[in-house]
Amino acid sequence: MSMKFMAALAFLALQLIVMAAGEDQSAQIMLDSDTKQYHRSSRNLRKRVHHARHDVAIVFNVEHYGAVGDGKHDSTDAFEKTWNAACNKLSAVFLVPANKKFVVNNLVFYGPCQPHFSFKVDGTIAAYPDPAKWKNSKIWMHFARLTDFNLMGTGVIDGQGNRWWSDQCKTINGRTVCNDKGRPTAIKIDFSKSVTVKELTLTNSPEFHLVFGECDGVKIQGIKIKAPRDSPNTDGIDIFASKRFEIEKCTIGTGDDCVAVGTGSSNITIKDLTCGPGHGMSIGSLGKGNSRSEVSFVHLDGAKFIDTQNGLRIKTWQGGSGLASHITYENVEMINAENPILINQFYCTSAAACKNQRSAVKIQDVTFKNIHGTSATTAAIQLMCSDSVPCSNIKLSNVFLKLTSGKVATCVNKNANGYYTNPLNPSCKSLHPGRTPKELELHQKPTTLLMDEKMGASLNSSPPNCKNKCKGCQPCKPKLIIVHPNQPEDYYPQRWVCSCHNKIYNP
């Protein structure tokens, strides 16, 4: 092969390399200041954000794509360009730098994108305060079809909703009536999997702040959501048709629900929630417009409700159908909260009374455990269930609520069936007393009735042979114990074990 040919080939290869580099120059040639800023602002999040194959993060700073962080100029196009450049890169970081304020109109951030994609807000993203300048969209920032996506940062996402509220709300006969037409949600995430939202502050959305639709596997940690007490429909976190959510250590104060779980949702876990002001935590509303709704396996463990309009609320419309079940609230403190415990199957937004209908969403298997504090309303517990589809298996355990004034609160119960274990204050007369949640030894014949734990079927079961089953402890004897002692009187799942000196061993 001639030297001239070799030289020409080398020159062609060099040209291709230069062309490829030029196509993605803004992404690959990173300024030292951007990289330093990203790592500096990520120190507190470093343990929380990691990449499965230890890929090197590529930072896409919105300023490099034309964004101007002076709080005046429109940076919408620059944000779109940044997203388009970052979406196709593995371990990309879309960076909104600190100490800058970027004004943007509505944005669409659609995937699919490469894995380990982070949208990092360390500065402020602000919406246009004037509704007249808003594009015709019900969503300000819409994320969709993403997998392994992080929305995080120490910055602020400000919906600047004041003008929306003042322009669309009027007081009629002492009642505030708002026109929700056109008022946008701040952030909506749809059709996405393995999503994390961390540390951000969301404030003053014209309507809902953070909404999820048809998502699977979402973690929300340490975010703050703020809006005035009288801001209309400014829900904090709304979840629809989604599953496997973990919400932890969030502080939310708005003009509506702090957290709302809507139809089609299941396996929702919430821990260490601080709510107030707002309308508390809601399941629903469900069954609107005679629709069918399903919600199951919602667990709130650890919460504080401060000066809220409601505490723990399940709300359904008359005429609907479906099921809301396996809902547990525990370890909750109420501080001057109105309606601390509320099941309302007569939910209605009309100024006039809604017509009583025969069908309703069924509510069953709901537990309120370790709930204490003060109520701003006389009825601290309200179990208002459907006439035709009563609530079943409602359980109250260690509930102690009194009025903020120190006076005795009351319980209002309509068509709610279930039981309680002491203490229960205020008392709910129609609920039945249940057994205390401790292991109960039953002295029965060698052959006894055993309730199958999963199916509830009756079985004949003989005591096991416990010889050599207690790891050297003597005497080792059969013992019948309650598996779930908090179940109602008519259902006591039991099983045989081997016991020695109050220690339990599997037979």
From Swiss-Prot:
InterPro entries: Glyco_hydro_28 (IPR000743), PbH1 (IPR006626), Pectin_lyas_fold (IPR012334), Pectin_lyase_fold/virulence (IPR011050). It comes from the Eukaryota. The active site is at residues 256, 279. One of its GO terms (molecular function) is polygalacturonase activity. The keyword Glycoprotein applies. Keywords: Allergen, Cell wall, Cell wall biogenesis/degradation, Fruit ripening, Glycoprotein, Glycosidase, Hydrolase, Repeat, Secreted, Signal, Zymogen. Its EC number is 3.2.1.15. It is an enzyme of class 3 (hydrolase). Glycans are attached at residue 267. Pfam families: EPF (PF17181), Glyco_hydro_28 (PF00295). Residues 21-54 form a propeptide. It is found in: Secreted; Secreted, Cell wall. It catalyses: (1,4-alpha-D-galacturonosyl)n+m + H2O = (1,4-alpha-D-galacturonosyl)n + (1,4-alpha-D-galacturonosyl)m. GO terms for biological process: carbohydrate metabolic process; cell wall organization; fruit ripening. GO terms for cellular component: extracellular region. Residues 1-20 form the signal peptide. PbH1 repeats lie at residues 215-241, 242-263, 265-285, 295-316, 324-345, 358-385. Belongs to the glycosyl hydrolase 28 family. This is Polygalacturonase. It comes from Juniperus ashei. The lineage of its organism: Eukaryota, Viridiplantae, Streptophyta, Embryophyta, Tracheophyta. The gene is JNA2.
